[in-house]
Every structure is written in structure tokens, then in C-alpha cells.
UniProtKB/Swiss-Prot annotation, chains A, B, C, D:
Pfam families registered for this protein in UniProt: Chorismate_synt
InterPro entries: Chorismate_synth, Chorismate_synth_AroC_sf, Chorismate_synthase_CS
A single BP term in Gene Ontology: aromatic amino acid family biosynthetic process
Pathway: Metabolic intermediate biosynthesis; chorismate biosynthesis; chorismate from D-erythrose 4-phosphate and phosphoenolpyruvate: step 7/7
The name this protein goes by in its record: Chorismate synthase
Name of the gene encoding the protein in the UniProt record: aroC
Length: 391, 391, 391, 391
């Protein structure tokens, strides 16, 4: 049954396998009039791109092509399709995988579900994290539209393996973690993370981590009770990322250890005269609705399943127990690149709900709106460019 | 925009407010031929019912009425509607709430979204946990259908405030937590939980907790990549429960602290000759698909927001800061009753995906299937009855 | 699989069988702040009510109860549920039907699909036209919301059996067919229709007919290419009415006999300075989008299947050919009451698309909007009341 | 808001504009294991291809590429994507259109909805019938899957302008209309149609027509009451085709002129001992469900809007009335190629409902099923090949 679409008013449908000719995404529901260019999408993809230090060695240029929905540089209201060709594909690295499902991977469940004879094992096929590039590509459009409500999203790697950020961090620092090749929001943290990564690489092992995403200026009242609450849709979107095994927002699991008098927040009049909450303990969501405070959520990534260390598995040809050393080209910690994917998923959910709640016009932008979005986007890109180069 | 429906092939739509004439649910997608009675639904509701020791004092009989979709004791394929009248309603307890939004509650976000003038504040209106009775009612049908695949769901309160179960626990013990008024799976734990509850009641405070849900005999391959993965739909469903602020499955957040060589599981040949995983570290879901191992997931409940202790809020009449002591009748730990709601949500997601994957016939049950389900259900009820009475 | 919901932003889910305790509808997606009363719904239902001259003798009071989603006379944003109890039920009239499926009815297909043992034959069960009362009830809310765009819908019986209106008719005349017990838009036509009906009643037979629906002031640009075009969603909605076997808009089937130079319309500057079409040959829809001209569509109703004349069928007990004379209480021409149902379906589709295109705020109405709607609605009711009484 | 997807279990999402780099379709919900090749898709496309006698002069090779979802010649369960590059594009023919919206076309409504500045006027942009090639491509997969239930679909041009088939026609003759370049099911009809077309071409005019689609061996019980009835979903699908302005099934509009005793069918025991209907007056659908008889439906195509004859329009630069002679390369009767598109839409709806009703396994085909489908498909292609060549 279909499962490759997400969103009700801003709806993405992704397609493509790791070692097929291309991956891509159809974005349906983009209002007409938005300026959008290949460069806008490339820009967002640049923060996810493999082939950098500390991540997988696969050298994909990730060059997006917009093949529908845009005319003369602006969206037309028709479905917007982006394709990204797969260039740097070495399927031969996966020959062993064909017979020996990799522990921690989707290999065996896919075989169980779809049949061994129908399994595209090359590079993980459809279950490969390569698919997430489509999501990040689509998120460029989401982020541009969110300029209309001044919503900006920052994300960083809050913990990597045993190392966790345990001091205060500003939205600015989180946002600027784009500067860091390991998405650390503090310099000292970056060093510690890099050390862990190097050590794991040497050992042929990997680390898990926690990505934290913050969104500023989230429109008030996003979320539709009782099942399409903002927290529900965010949880679904984040759990749809490969390797994500947990989600929490606000106090999250810590709240389960607390008393009501600790976990409840105080309702106050803010300096701007508006009602709000003193400490934002709820992470910006109360009653399932955005409440005007910063959105704060985290998701747990398990360690990269592909490791060089030998692991026990079964040889499907002989049905005998065997071992495998996964050789492909893999991230020592998927959580690092996962940060930008988590950020993308939050953008996709927020823009969907901003449309659902009427904050963004569903059919077309006015000329003013289109222009303002473009100006804000230019400033955003300018601001982020040094970060892009630093990585 | 609509948000009150969940599921694609087994689709529930709930309605009703805490202090309206009734709450209810339409279940669309139930195959014809299933035996279903008011008693079946009442049975499941009995484990959630307020008015017991350690939970809210509201005395609702929770008497469900099936008003459509069943003829001569069997489903007809038409939408099945269950209504539950609200009887024990004391709206006067909420007069103060009308002007003083309760910290930690949906009050203020609902006002922000829908307008103060349209806010049904009585008993929390639509945001009340009362709505979850509709879900539990619907879950009786889900659980009966899941008898076809021998899928059984157990759930317990894994931690309450600072007290956490830190020893091995069997599926049987978890299942039998229905015996416990605080949903503890061990006797010593029950005592500790009860103590905490009593103390909180005295203090006019509340506690958070973690519910763990285990499902045995989950059909293999449930979940639809890449967005309707089983983990995604479970996360969405569980986060849609009021007061749930976190979700994890398998190793969950702990995996984020681990190395790949620790977090990966071993693929082995089981005693029955089938492929499987040695330790079920993945909690029954790999690649987003159920893998034949037990489903293991947890969700974090924040402490009950309604506490008698005075809390800071704002009086909407004067726009001045004020305090409120929430007096209604509330659970000292929503997590306790939350256990049965979490269990219900898991049942609803599993049956939806079992239908999506073809494990349950979409249109009608054969006579054999209907009879087998009924027999298994009778055994299940007999088994659980002593638990019901012990509470 | 679920099939009892319609609409994406204004979503109705109906439930209930002809001889069950009640029928009803959940309307999800109604913005908060709309004034709505039981009387508003009763008013719309009055034009569909059976128990009048020329239609079925079943005496249903059709008294709607709003059981959720409204507080203090205004919608809250929560799902709005309306129930209508079934009172005048005589199931004994259906004893013969149990074994002899009625020609032209859903009896045998329902038995084939859901199983004989699960078939609620009483009054046609779920397939009864009784279900359409839920749709008309929901359409009251749709029509009120459409007051915001001044959209008004008129409908009449364009033909009954061999008699067809073949002269010009104004929107006003069509709208005022509510005065007529047979939904005729001209006095001479009314007489002819009544004669036909009387004759059919005497013969124990029935007639088919064509309902025409016109909507004035339809917002421009409704419809979402390429599958949710306005014409597509209208066709689906109208074909979902029992006994409807055909749909056309604008020139409809006549266009298939024409040349392009005849069927094309002229694009002109209207007196108000706006672009438009000279003759509205397209019936208000071009490219699948509403184009600002009046919406004009028709649907064909087959004759009432329930007739007293003996018809050939098979006795399911003996598997031998047999005959049946259907005795229940039935309309001699379902098309008559079908007019109000067709009108309701058009309202439901238009309001859904008006929401999708941003003409109606998705979350809540402003105080001004709520007031203006109410004023216009009052005028509409006042205008229609004499029509109600005349029937 | 998204509108480019159709179907619940077999879900197509199309993208692409007439003069963009490519058009295409994602098919989500295809079970794994189906053999599928580029040739299969090309085969179906061949019956729709422009560039033949009597249809548009645009010479598109319509060469489909499968870029995802297939591995080693079989579907994998991942979304299957087909792209078709646009090669023979002459946008210069549309320069006049840019300022003079064409009567009968989507031009002006698209401008009204999405804004003049966002309008891709080249070749009709998204509203071009070119998009229907994506649907026909997807229908190849649908038709293959329907081999499992032996469902075969035939379609022919029942009338063209004033000429209508008024004698009996067999399913075989209808099916073999693929032989005819004008989709006529009788030789004498073919000649009359060709004459009409030639005359229209000379005059610079066009004709409307009616396509009739018949499906044999439709599984029993397809359709989900009360809104996703088979007739409703068919109506929606057919009305989504550009230029379709009417739909009917069975007796259709003729039933509206009849008495119940004429329109009702007789329920009988068929020669095979099964229950059925004597005359199939209902066209295979009763109560909204397929009833085991042949599906019979028709849709009305208006005449091609693009004609060389001068027509009145408005010049958008001057806002003055003007005339246009549409020069591009167009079919003299869209209904001719419309036959294959109507056939495709019926296949798409039937396969969706066959999956919804459990006739086709939702996740994967067994080896036997895959093989049987392939064998039947080969026979079907062999049978149709001479027809392909004759055109």
C-alpha cells in the first residue's frame, strides 16, 4: 500500500533507490509565484552532502534538476518535481550483502516483506539513507515559504555517543552549527565529537547521537486535534528518518521523572504584552498546538549499522550462521548528517501545518509576498554561506 | 482542517467533548462478519475507567452503545459507531478555568487558535483526556481482529516519577499488570508506585511516568516505507495521546549513546528454524518494518497538569498575573490510565497495518475466521477477568 | 476499506442504517465561530423530508441533534456531530426482502460483498436513501459557510420521465422550485409532474428524472488539477447518491454532438469590466476550474427501484426464480427528493474547495465574518420559508 | 492544495508540463514481484500516441523510462516511476496564446487562479492533454495486475459528432476497435468517422464524441459505500480527463426517462448456476458495487477546443476584444485518443478497488501469480499487436 507521501497541503512523494538512475521528489501543493531556483535547492543539499570529512566517502555531486512546476523561475502551482541523478555508484561493494543480510539494516525485513527475489540490495535500495536527499531538496521550498512567517529552523548534534552538551546554548549557536563539520554548536564540543569519530573510524565502529531541532517564530496554533496534533505529525516525520529510534519535545522523557509542580510552566505576560510561558518547558507545543514559544525537539539516532567490525549474520544460500564486515562507504555516525535531515523534516511538517492553518496562501503568493520571501531568503543564504564554506 | 481521524484501512474518527452530551467514535473499515457486543467494548473500557482508586474521582459508567454497523451481533461492513454518554459532569468546577488558563494545559493554546469566544472550557472540552475513552472503545474491535494473527498486546507502567523498573520482566508479567491498580508488573513496584501516588495526593501534586507496550506475534513486514513505516505511525499515534511527550522503541534513546557494535543485533537461525535476531535490540522494528520479534516501545507521560498546588497564570479578564489551584477531579498520574490508552493506540496502528499488509481480509471474515476470533477472544477475556476484578 | 468520508478540508463521515437506532454525520474541518443551531439544520432537512405528498409515506420527524462541536451556539473547531434518530421504522415490511433480493436494489450486491449472514436487510440497511439525510444535515453548515462568498445554490427537477423542461428558466425560478412539492420550476411543469406521479402511483410503478443544480457566485478558481478538478469532485459526489446513474455539466452530452466552433464560448469583457464568457456554455467550469460563471450541472436519477408491480427475482432459500412486489413505503420518483440531495452534495463540494482555495478561513471566522454569515443566512431562511410552507 | 494523485491503494501521482523537459508518473502501491518492462508500457502508450493519421501532428516518440521501483525486471514494492521526455516541442506556436486566451481552453481559468505571471502557456502547460500520457503509462501496470482476475477492458468511440453506433456490438468488436485509427468498432462506422474528421480538418473545425468503455470479468463487490462507490470513483476518474463533460453507466441518462418496471432488471440464475441479472441494465454496478456483470460506461468528450477557425477572445495586453485562430498541432477530435485515456482511467480505478477489496495481494505476488500474469499479458499483447500495426 502507498507509503511514500507525507503531508496534506504541502505533500511530498519521494522515489528512487540508492543505485538506480536517479532519486527524486514531487512536491504537490506549492502555491504559485514562489521564486525557486536550482541553486536554492543545492544550497540546502550542501549541508547534507556526503563526500565531506567525517561522513561517507561516496562522492555525490547531488545536483538537483527541477523538471516540472517552475516556469521563468517561479512556481506555477503545478506539482514541482526535483530529480537528483545517482552518479557515484559502486554496486560491486554490495555483492556480499546479497547473501548476508547486514545486522541493524533493513535488508532482512525487506526480504521478509517483499521477497528475496524482488530485493534491490544494491546500496540498500529503497531503504538507503540516500532517499533523504529528496527530503532535504523539498525542504528548501518549505523553508522559503516559511520565510513568510519569519520561521527559522536551527539544528545541532546535541550528543554523540557518550559526549553530550550540558551547558546553555543559544538559538544562534545552534543555527551556526552549520559551520561545524560535525554539527556541534560549541567549539569544545566539536573537538570532542571529532575525536570520537576518528576513534570509531579507526576501530571500524560507529556512534549514535541525538539531534536537536529548534524553530523560532513558529506561527501560533499549528496542529489539528486530536490526531494531527503538531507533536504527532512531527513524531511521525522524524521517526520516518532511517536510524531514528526516539523522539521527544520540550522536557521530553525527563518530564516522566518529574512532579506536576516542576513540569508545569507559568503563564505570564511577556515584555511585548502578549501572553506566553516563562520557561518554555513545553518546548513550544501545548495541547498538541504550537503556542508561540520556540519549538524544541530531539530525536535519537542509533549508531550507523554499517561497520567494518565483523558481525554475526546468516548466509542465505546455506542458511548457516556466518559473519560480515560491511565495507561500502558509510558515515561513522549517521546522526551528523541526520541533523540536516531532521531539520528538513521539521520544515516540511511546519510548512504543511502553516498552510493548514491559513498562514500561507494555498493557491498563490501575492507579488509582495513573493518578493519579501525572496529578500529574506537571500539574507538567509548570505548569512549561512560562510558556514557552508567552513565545513 | 480535519484532524480527528486516524488510520488508512482501519480508520477511527472520534468526536465529543468532556462535558457535552456524549463522546464517540466511528470505526470505518471493519470487515463484515466479526462478532462484536457491547460487552466486548465495555471489557476494554473497564481497564481505563476513571472512578477507581488512584485515578480521577469522576464516576463515569462508561457504558458504550453500538449504534451502527452491527446487526444480529455481527459487523456488517458498514461504519461501526460507538457512543458513550457523559453522565457525571460537574461543569461548575471549571468556572475559574474560564478566566484563568491552567498551566500545562491546552486551555491557552485552544484560546489562541480557535478564539476565546469559541472555547468550550468545561472539563477541558475537546482537549480532555475523556476523548481517549473513544479510542479504547475502538481498540476492542482492533484487538479482536488481531486475534486472527494471534497478536496480543501487553502494557505496564515502567516508571513512575523517580521509581523505575530495573529488572527483567516477562511478557506475562507485563500482560498481568492489568491486575494492578497502578499498572505495575511487579508486586514490589506496585507498592512503591502506590506510595508515590498517595504522597502526591497529599501534596496536591502529581507524577509523570513511562508506559511500555509490548506486542507479541506481530505479523512480519508491517509498515510501508518510507513515510508510513511502522515506527512512524506508532510514534504519531502515541504522541496523539494527551500528556505524551516522548516516544522510543527498542533501545530507544539509549542507542544514541552506543557504538554500532553494541547496538547492532545478531541475525541468527532460531530454534524453530526461522531467521531472527538474537537479542531483539531493535524492539521488533527494523527498516521501519516489523521483523517478527516482539514489538517493544515506550512513551513518556508528563505529570498530570491539574494539581491542587497554586500555580502562576494570568487572569484573562484583567490581563494580570494571578494564581490558580486546579480543583476538578484528576488523576494524580495520568500515566497510570495512560497505559491502557497507549495499549489501545498500538492495537489501532497494528490492525491498520495488518489490514494494509493483507493479514486480515479487508471486506469480510470467513465463517471460520469469525468463529476462531470469537473463541480466542473468549479465552482472552476469561484470562483477564480476574485482573479486572482485582483492581 | 473505509469509504464513508468525503472532502479534504470540510470532511463529512456518515454512519447509520435505515432501521438502526440513529443515523448521523461527523463534520470535521468546520472553522470555529460559526453560529449554528438545530433549527438551521432542521430547515435544510425540511426540504428533503419524507412523509409529504408525492414522496414516501415514512413519517420521520428528522429531528437533528447536535451532540458535539458547538458551544454556546457557535462552532468550536472540534468535530461537529449531528445525529437523527430513526423513529418510524417498520422492519416487518422487509421480511420478504430477506429472501428475495429486490431488482434494481443494492440487496444482492451487498449480499455478494459482505455475506448473506452479515446483511442488514431492514429498510435497505446502509444502502438506504435514508443515509442521505445525514448529507443534507451537513449541507446546512456548508451553505452557511458559503454565505461568506455569497454563493447560493438552486436546484430543480429538470425532467421527470418523458416530461422535460424545454424553455428558458431563470436562477430565481430554479431557486423557487422549493415552493413546489415536485421541485418543478414552472407551474405548468408542476402540473405535468404531478399527473405523472399520480399515474405511476396507481400503476404501482415509478419514474426517473433529471435534477439540475445551479450555483451562483461560485468563487473563481475552485478545483485542483489534475485529479481533484472541480468537475471530478462534483461527479464523484453526485454519483455517490443512490440511484444517480449519470452526470454532466454545461453542455454535457450534447457537446459530444457538436463542432468546436459551436461548443466553444466567446471570451468577452463583461459589463462590470471583468473577463468572462458570453454564453456560459462550459457551465462554469473550464480546465476543471470554476471560471466565475454560474455553475450548471445535471444528474440523472433512475426510477425508484421499489415498485409494487411484480418483478422477477430469485428466492435465496430455494435458489429458484420467483417474483416480488415491493411493499415498503417508497417515493414514486426518487428524483424529487433527490433534488435536495444533489443540491446538498454540490454545497459540500463547493465548501470543501472554497476552503482548499483559501476563500474561507480554515481555523476560525472573525467576529465580522460570523455576524455577516448569520445575517445573510437569516435573510436566506426568511426568503425560503414561504416555499417551505407551500409544499 | 495537492490534487495530482489518484487512488488509495494503487496511487498515481503525475507531474510535468507539455513543454517542460519531461512528464511522468509515480505509481505507489504496486505489489512486489510483477514483471514489468519498458516495452509493456510502450505497448499501451502506442494506442494513445499522437503523430498518427487523424490525430495531432505532434511527433512524440513517447519513449517511457522506468527510473525506480523495478529491479531485474520485477517490481520491488518501492514506488515505480516512469518518465517520458518531451522531444517534439515547438513553443513558438504558442506566442499568440500568451496574450489571447483560447476559448474552450484552460488558459483563462489558470490565469485567474494562479496569476498571469505564473502561467506556463507553452503548449497548455500543465492543463495540456499531454499529461494523460502519464496516466496511460501507469495503466499498463494496472492492466497487468488485473490479469490476475482476468479482467479485460475494451473501449471504442461510440459516437462522433452526429454519427452514432446504433446497432448491437460485441465485447470482441469493441476490444478490436484498437485496429481502427478512429477507434470505431464497425467498419462502416470507421468510414463515417473518417469522413467527418476529414471534413472538420478542411473546415478548421473539430467534433465531439462519446467513448464507451466495457470491462469484462470485473471482480464482484468492488466499491466502498457510501462515498467511494465504484460508480463515484469511476465518475471522478473519467471527469478528470481534459475535455470530458459527462459520465454515465448502464442505462445512464436514458434511465431518467423510464419507468421502474422498464429500468429494473430481472435477477436470475445464470447457466453457470450463479445469481445474476438478465439484461445488465445496471451496467455492472448496483448499490455502487460491481455485481459481476460487464461494466458498461460512457463519457462525453466535447469537441477539441483548438480550432483554426477564428474565434472571439480578449487580448490581455489591451483588454480589448480580439480574435484568435489556434494554429498548434491538434487532434480534430480529442475523443479519438480520449478512448484510450478513458480505458486507462477505468483500469486505474479497477485495480485500486481490486486491491481495496483484497483481490490482488497488497504486498507481493507469489511466484505463481507473477508467472500467470506474465503469460496472460503475453497473450494479450500478441492478440493486440495486429491492431497496433493496422492503425
Amino acid at each position: 500500500m502507498p507509503g511514500n507521501s507525507l503531508g496534506k497541503m504541502f505533500r511530498i512523494t519521494t522515489f528512487g533507490e540508492s543505485h538506480g538512475p536517479m532519486i527524486g521528489v514531487i512536491v504537490d501543493g506549492v502555491p504559485a509565484g514562489l521564486y525557486i531556483s536550482k541553486e536554492d535547492i543545492e544550497f540546502e543539499l550542501s549541508f547534507r552532502r556526503p563526500g565531506k570529512q567525517f561522513v561517507s566517502g561516496r562522492r555525490e555531486k547531488d545536483e538537483p534538476e527541477i523538471v516540472s512546476g517552475v516556469y521563468n523561475g517561479r512556481t506555477t502551482g503545478a506539482p514541482l518535481t526535483i530529480i537528483i541523478r545517482n552518479n557515484d555508484v559502486i554496486s560491486s561493494l554490495y555483492e556480499e550483502v546479497k547473501h548476508k543480510p547486514r545486522p541493524g539494516h533493513a535488508d532482512l525485513p525487506y526480504i521478509m516483506k517483499y521477497g528475496y527475489e524482488n530485493w534491490d540490495y544494491r546500496g540498500g535500495g529503497r531503504s538507503s539513507a540516500r532517499e533523504t536527499a529528496s527530503r532535504v531538496a523539498a525542504s528548501a521550498i518549505a523553508k522559503k515559504l516559511l520565510m513568510l512567517t519569519d520561521t527559522v529552523i536551527g539544528a545541532h548534534l546535541k550528543s554523540l555517543g557518550p559526549v553530550e552538551l550540558d551547558e546553555d546554548v543559544s538559538f544562534r549557536e545552534i543555527f551556526c552549527s552549520k559551520y561545524s563539520p560535525v554539527r556541534a554548536s560549541k567549539k569544545w564540543l566539536e573537538e570532542k565529537y571529532e575525536e570520537l569519530i576518528k576513534q570509531a573510524t579507526v576501530e571500524g565502529d560507529s556512534w549514535g547521537g541525538v539531534a536537536e531541532v529548534i524553530a523560532d517564530n513558529v506561527p501560533i496554533g499549528l496542529g489539528e486535534p486530536v490526531f494531527d496534533k503538531l507533536k504527532s505529525d512531527l513524531a511521525k516525520a522524524l521517526l520516518s528518518i532511517p536510524a531514528v529510534v526516539g523522539f521527544e519535545y520540550g522536557l521530553g522523557f525527563k518530564a516522566s521523572k518529574m512532579k506536576g509542580s516542576e513540569a508545569n510552566d507559568e503563564i505570564v505576560i511577556k515584555d511585548n504584552g502578549k501572553l506566553g510561558w516563562r520557561y518554555n518547558k513545553a518546548g513550544g507545543i501545548l495541547g498538541g498546538l504550537s503556542n508561540g514559544e520556540k519549538l524544541v525537539l530531539r530525536c535519537a539516532f542509533k549508531p550507523t549499522s554499517s561497520i567494518r567490525k565483523p558481525q554475526k549474520t546468516v548466509d542465505l544460500r546455506t542458511s548457516e550462521e556466518s559473519t560480515i564486515r560491511v565495507i561500502g562507504r558509510h558515515d561513522p555516525a549517521v546522526a551528523i548528517r541526520g541533523v540536516s535531515v531532521a531539520e528538513a523534516m521539521v520544515a516540511l511538517v511546519l510548512v504543511d501545518h502553516a498552510l493548514r492553518s491559513g498562514y500561507i496562501p494555498p493557491v498563490k503568493l501575492s507579488e509582495d509576498q513573493a518578493r519579501i520571501i525572496e529578500e529574506k531568503w537571500r539574507r538567509y543564504v548570505e548569512e549561512c554561506k560562510p558556514m557552508q564554506e567552513s565545513q
